[in-house]
Amino acid sequence: MAHEITDEFVASLHASSDSARAVARNAVAHAGVEPVAFDRAKVVATPTVVSHKVDDWKVTSQKKSGRCWLFSSLNLLRSTARTHLGLKDFEFSQNYVLFWDKFERANFFLTDVIATAKTEDLDGRLLQFLLGDVLSDGGQWDMAVSLYLKHGLVPKVAMPETESSGHTAPMNGRLKVVLRRTALELRSLVEAGASEEEIREVKEAALADVWRILVICLGEPPASFEWEWRDDKGEFHRDGVLTPREFYERYVDVDLTQYVCLVDDPRAEHPKGHTLTVDHMGNVVGGRPILYVNTPVEQIREITASILASGRAVWFGADCGQQSDRASGLFVEGLYDFDNLFGVDFSTSKEQRVNTGESAMNHAMLFTGVDIDEEGNARRFRVENSWGEEPGEKGFFTMDAAWFDANVFEVAVHVDDLPAELRAVVTEEPLHLPAWDPMGALA
């Protein structure tokens, strides 16, 4: 059914203008949409203090990069390492794990290209998705765990930030050219019946180019380093020469193999209480598979609050673009009253937003506090972001419970923190979602 826009219809729209609309039009023309829709009463009604606070450290900054998943997971690990080291503001090297993520992900991509060469058309949806998304900065909790378990960690002083680690786009652009060109070459070799050795030679030549680019942009990752430091009390310590794996094993007392991700996939066709995975998502060949336990968001909120009340931080993924304000550091449902500004009903369910591409998890952060009232209800959460100290309360944000339910999609928790019914499904065969599914959006 096709209907043109008629002059009569346009004339009726002109005739429907009123004085209230004129006021809104003038205000938006002068200040923009969000400042006019901003509900200051929500700010006043949202204190930033919480009853249970884990953090007493400074925030970090991912700068102009998409490394939120690495920063937030490292911030979780440093919350324990800092205690062992006696350094309140200790940081692991985010640049070190970025290097290994890019290198491992290049190998993961090329391996995928070879595996799909005979079954997937170049102009098919899967190959076009893989080629379009090659070597993005984003990632998932399980991908971070794969990196840390294989390559260990180093302190920031052992591999500090560079211009390219904080502004990855130019480096990524060069890497994509190498990988996309090699993908075509590898597909041609497979289709022509080339030997495994011939295919490996082309792949390893491309990986050598990737390594060269990464070393120039990020520096060479240390195979070992001498670790010595002065703690916050002024006492000097020397641990001698350590490998990254040894450093990780000595100072990270979190068993990452026992963590599982709970997600709120609101789509009716994906039942709660079952596991999910996203095909072709990962970074380390042979690494930890992506695994989610689909869980009602109310239960995710309760589990998160319980962990925070016990004094432990929680990694999570959310859609940070919804009803949020960077300057005041607020994630508050209804922070912007777009309905009254425009006279339009913008209400949609979480399921509708996911199904239409309106919402997906796009940013990972760390919960570091919760406010629990006298009845035991979690009213708001304290969030450590990785955007530096300028936003919010020196980089920390405040989230209300309604925003949590509407926009938080994922948390990573220890299996011991799960109720028995969720622990029981962790080992079941997951439902496989396609590579382009919204549940893979953070990566």
Regions found by a protein language model. Give the residues of each.
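N-terminal regions that are enriched for targeting/export leaders
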Residues: 2-57
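Short acidic/polar alpha-helix capping motifs at helix-coil junctions
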Residues: 14-20, 45, 265-269, 329-333
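Active-site nucleophile-adjacent alpha helix/oxyanion-hole segment immediately C-terminal to the catalytic cysteine
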Residues: 43-314, 391-394, 401
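Short helix/strand-bridging catalytic loops that position acidic/His residues to coordinate divalent metals
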Residues: 53-57, 350-352, 384
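Catalytic nucleophile-His microenvironment captured as a short glycine-rich beta-strand/loop
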Residues: 68, 148, 355-388
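Short His-Asn-centered micro-motif
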Residues: 71, 316-319, 368
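Long, positively charged binding patches that form subdomain-scale interaction surfaces
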Residues: 287-362
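Conserved catalytic-core surface of thiol
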Residues: 373-443
